[in-house]
Amino acid sequence: MSTPLKLVAFDLDGTLTQHKTPIEPQNRAVLEALSQRYHLLMVGAGNAQRIFHQLGDFPIDVIGNYGMQQGTYDPESRSLRVESAAPVPCDREDILARAAELRYRCGFTQYTGGSVEFHDSGVLTFALLGTEAAQADKLAFDPDRSKRRAVLDQVVEAFPEFNVFVGGSSSFDLAPKPYDKRYALERYCAVHGIDLSEAAFCGDDYGPGGNDECVYRAGVRFFKVDDYRRFGETVAELL
């Protein structure tokens, strides 16, 4: 007999919403129903406050930046209190030089805006189409992630001090080691007295290089969300 669940955790973009798009009413309603039975948690790649607002300020704890931000929902103020880990510094010129070499080698020399986005936490976004590319172009660039998976090993080799993920719709996310979603989930569960066998995770990016893959391969009960518009069907057994 399986262990009863106490916590259900979620990825955001591609799982509950389209990329960087507000949550739709039907998926918010599913979250509300799940919240009556389980402790809920967001485990995201992006900024915790951005995730919280993308969810329409839904009452939920939010882990951002692969665990470098811990956001706790405050029911009195209906807001998210965020504590951040100490930023991990990097040599920007060196990072940009490595990114330029990768672009030349892999054929991604045309881009709009910057090549790499440097987040305050120390997480980096290697934006193949550039930091100012149009959202429509990003969504159309690599929907099956095959272009990025083809060069994933080269990106991993170029940035050994980071965990590298096929992130978003057209980029790679680089999180300073040891930060990733598995590490973040394990730390949260330990603090809240929850065993990993009592947790489930819902995500869409569980394939090679995906930022949900580390959770999927950790043996955590995993719900594969292959279409965010069918999220409710995917988790129906939890309701």
Residue spans for each PLM region:
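Mg2+-dependent phosphoryl-transfer enzymes with acidic/Ser/Thr/Gly-rich catalytic loops
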Residues: 3-4, 23-24, 175-177, 181-239
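Conserved acidic, metal-coordinating active-site core of Asp-based
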Residues: 105, 110-200, 208-211
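Short, solvent-exposed loop/turn segments at secondary-structure boundaries
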Residues: 20-23, 138-140
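Active-site phosphate-binding/coordination module
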Residues: 21-113
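Asp-based phosphoryl-transfer active-site loop
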Residues: 4-21, 212
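Hydrophobic "anchor" residues on beta-strands that sit immediately upstream
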Residues: 7-9, 61, 200
